[in-house]
Amino acid sequence: GELCKNTPITNGSDLLKNGEDRPNTIYGSTDCGISVENGTALTYKFDKPEYIRTLHLTFNSDLNRDTLPGDFPERSHSMRCNVKLDSPQCYVPKTLCRKFSLSLGTPSGTKMIIDTDCNLRRSYNIDINEAVQSITLIPYSNWGETDKTQIFSYDFK
């Protein structure tokens, strides 16, 4: 909505609000979202409490399989029926956020929505349904143990 579009994200970018949940050549994009230093808080702050219905969050789960081991056939055929002993092992995508927290600043204090150190999900659609003063996302690590974590979408209605 308009509120999300017009509210800046501290340490973030409007690329998180453009509706693209993955790079797609149909949209003319080769990349989307932003990469943030682990431990950096991405915060929406409001001048007064605003009613938020839902929050949408999408991390990079390497749908293009660029970080998987092996050659193209190994990366593109995820449901192999014949697995050789020397076949590359599949694992959680290295680009996926592993540890993060999501909290709301409410008139009565901070409300933790998600605080996980073993995330396996690419996308979240979270019902909020309350008036909040701020929304804060902090990615702490990813499965590839790099210094930055890529976030594709972080918006609300």
Model-derived features with residue positions:
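Predominantly extracellular/luminal regions of secreted and cell-surface proteins
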Residues: 1-21
